[in-house]
């Protein structure tokens, strides 16, 4: 089983339908689709990207399960034509965290389970160009997974 694909799917499902101020926030996997229509909230285009992932064997391997650690990056972005505010990305990131912690720790038919979810990085980035300012809330989650053989 590809644990990276499974975890990415679970995160996508947990975030799907997320709204802020009555506006649904689009979610992209890997990168922003340049042809996508982005919603505007408080003058900024807003979206979420599920980015980098990695998986590696856990140091502890009990007899009845196979343990893996999987990291995944969620980036909440708001892009403004001029200067904007970090409020939107910070509020949306809080809702992202609530959804992740509330829905990901579910066992999938005794095949893959999530023991712990840790928010290992919570970072605010500001990027500027001559014409735009972008605010990103970067959330990196570390998932302790266990796989059983059925």
Where are these regions (language model features)?
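Acidic-leaning, charged glycine-interspersed low-complexity segments
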Residues: 44-46, 97-148
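Short, cysteine-centered beta-strand-loop-beta hairpins and adjacent loop/turn segments enriched
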Residues: 55-61, 77-84, 146-150
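Small/polar-rich, solvent-exposed N-terminal microdomains that initiate assembly or binding
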Residues: 1-64, 103, 107-111
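Oligomerization/assembly interface segments of phage tail-like spikes and tubes
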Residues: 66-82, 134-146
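Intrinsic-disorder/low-complexity loop/linker signature
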Residues: 22, 61, 83-86, 109, ...
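Extracellular/virion structural assembly segments
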Residues: 63-69, 77-103
């Amino acid at each position: 089983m590809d644990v990276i694909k499974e975890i990415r799917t679970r995160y996508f499902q947990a975030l799907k339908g997320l709204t802020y101020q009555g506006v649904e926030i689009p979610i992209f996997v890997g990168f922003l689709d340049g042809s996508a229509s982005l919603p505007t909230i408080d003058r900024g285009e807003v979206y979420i990207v599920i980015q980098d992932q990695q998986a590696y064997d856990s140091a502890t391997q009990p007899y009845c399960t196979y343990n893996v650690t999987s990291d995944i990056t969620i980036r909440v972005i708001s892009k403004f034509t001029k200067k904007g505010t970090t409020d939107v990305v910070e509020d949306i990131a809080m809702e992202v965290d609530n959804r992740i912690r509330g829905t990901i720790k579910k066992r999938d038919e005794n095949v893959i389970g999530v023991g712990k979810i840790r928010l290992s990085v919570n970072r605010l980035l500001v990027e500027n160009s001559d014409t735009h300012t972008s605010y990103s809330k970067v959330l990196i989650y570390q998932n302790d997974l266990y796989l059983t053989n059925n």
